[in-house]
Amino acid sequence: MAAQPPRPVGERSMGSSREAARAPARSPAWASTQASTPGAALAVQRESPESGLQKHYSNLCMEKSQKINPFILHILQEVDEEIKKGLAAGITLNIAGNNRLVPVERVTGEDFWILSKILKNCLYINGLDVGYNLLCDVGAYYAAKLLQKQLNLIYLNLMFNDIGPEGGELIAKVLHKNRTLKYLRMTGNKIENKGGMFFAAMLQINSSLEKLDLGDCDLGMQSVIAFATVLTQNQAIKAINLNRPILYSEQEESTVHVGRMLKENHCLVALHMCKHDIKNSGIQQLCDALYLNSSLRYLDVSCNKITHDGMVYLADVLKSNTTLEVIDLSFNRIENAGANYLSETLTSHNRSLKALSVVSNNIEGEGLVALSQSMKTNLTFSHIYIWGNKFDEATCIAYSDLIQMGCLKPDNTDVEPFVVDGRVYLAEVSNGLKKHYYWTSTYGESYDHSSNAGFALVPVGQQP
């Protein structure tokens, strides 16, 4: 059984002793809002928009003796203004603690307790981003309660909230019965192997969740293998992120199991396996599976230990695979030989790949120029990211020519040519497959699709 989260200030115990032992019990005021008739339920659902979310939040904080969080108050005021303008349908409430130029008071588990009481009746809010706050396991408990009550929520972002294995267990178990949530981000919460196993067990039951992000969650070998096993049967998950597990073996057992899964799963569209210690034998396992897989469109194997020998297998499978559209090979070591293998395939055989990232792969001019030549003959191949390699003059001229000829749009690459004293150089541009994976501004140029090209090219399910 998960550890009991501490009861926030102002919560008064009620109910049976068993219920009280398991979780914070309802206060009389909270219980009084539970509608007993359809008419009363409708009145509760309409309470927030009529009185205003900001006012409702202030009143609840006073009632529960909870300190008002000015950040939450400001965001709810913005939502109230949208409602007044008639923009109340399908709102994503953005209370992320890291997307403001001015420092904000981050949301704690106790703050989320009050917020969840408001949101459970807001049927026009279908997305919630509370990433980069201080929810901890207390907040995870109330997030689980919210998923029980709020049946319109399709997107929930809890990334980097210091949620541990116990909090992960609470979230995973409530998803056994939830049938509305489509996209869950748990990124950066150290739920570890124990929490990962609960999420894997959840996927045996849940048939509605489409995207699950468990990157940087300290998953263990056991849980990664469990996910690979479960996904041979789960037909709902379209995208899964298993980045940076804690692996102690050099045998690549997890990659072997993922390869077996890809042979049987024909629903998965995006697979992220960054920092899995994948070597050439591991990429061979994945490529062998891709001969039989007809659904995967986005493969992320960045930050691994793949060399030019591994590119032999990838280049070969790309000759016959017609579904892969985005491949992220960033921060490996494919060098000139690997780039040449890919270039030959993209020039003469493959007409389905749209985007390739070879950032920081120790590629020199020969390999980079070869890839640029592929873009001249392959009109489908439209996005390439090459920063962090060894540019010579021929490379700079080749990519400058690509952009000037219109074969490569400036937004579809991470370099920009400039001339000094008659010589062409390349500067870095902030575009990429997942440049703003950890943080995306809600305004300005960084919100353009070019900044997150991989996600724009391969949209999965409902977007937040």
Curated annotation (Swiss-Prot):
SUPFAM superfamilies to which the protein is assigned, alphabetical: RNI-like (SSF52047)
Residue span of region Disordered: 1-48
Amino acid composition bias (Low complexity), ranges on this chain: 16-32
Keyword Repeat: yes
Locations listed in the record: Nucleus; Nucleus, Nucleolus; Cytoplasm
Predominant location: nucleus
GO cellular component terms given for this protein: cytoplasm; nucleolus
Matching SMART domains: LRR_RI
Protein name (database record): Leucine-rich repeat-containing protein 34
Organism of this sequence: Homo sapiens
Encoding gene per record: LRRC34
